[in-house]
Regions:
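Positively charged, helix-rich recognition surfaces that bind polyanionic ligands
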Residues: 1-189
Length: 189
């Protein structure tokens, strides 16, 4: 939608400025494209959050731990296209929707910082800078440990959960099985 909005904006502004209008308003067509983009994002977020809630209810989960990515966009330059995509994601809206939908079913949502979660081995004693190694992330999406190869996102989520339990004082031994092939759920096509 972004490219279509940019194309329409350029086309409309050139028509308006040729006519001598100093501050052109967006066209009706451009407003429709904006609305369609907003509605698609809103619909997708509702589908994703509903899928999370349904999964939690089906598996008797009472606490959802999510990475706190506050200030993820600050002082980062990841390239023109990636910056546009990263800044377009409505993180606060996702947190809000998850929180109210989980609360309706008596499930709590906990935020946990993500420092070093994707760089530490799942077998490391703690998730800290001391045990973090960037060299373990050799390929995109893969985390290579001494003996095993894991999915990098699954290792990050596992370590976020470990950090949460360590912060609560609930040291739990959690199995590392399933980190190499996580469950993928298609919510919307």
């Amino acid at each position: 939608y972004d490219k279509e909005i940019a194309r329409l904006g350029h086309q409309w502004n050139s028509c308006q400025s040729a006519g001598g209008i100093k501050y052109p308003k967006p066209s009706k067509h451009m407003l429709k494209v904006y609305k369609k983009k907003r509605n698609c994002i809103h619909d997708y977020l509702h589908k994703v959050t509903r899928a999370v809630v349904n999964y939690c209810k089906a598996n008797d989960i009472h606490t959802v731990i999510i990475g706190d990515i506050t200030n993820i966009r600050r002082n980062k330059n990841l390239g023109k296209v990636t910056n546009q995509k990263l800044h377009a994601l409505p993180y606060a809206k996702i947190y809000g929707m998850l929180e109210y939908k989980l609360a309706m079913h008596g499930i709590t949502l906990a935020k946990q910082t993500e420092e070093y979660s994707s760089q530490c081995s799942p077998h490391a004693p703690q998730v800290t800078k001391e045990y973090a190694k960037k060299c373990n992330r050799t390929n995109r999406g893969l985390y290579k440990d001494q003996l095993s190869v894991y999915n990098a996102d699954a290792v990050g989520a596992y370590n976020i959960m470990r950090k949460y339990f360590a912060g609560c004082g609930k040291e739990k031994k959690i199995s590392v099985t399933g980190l190499s092939s996580p469950l993928i759920i298609k919510v919307a096509v």
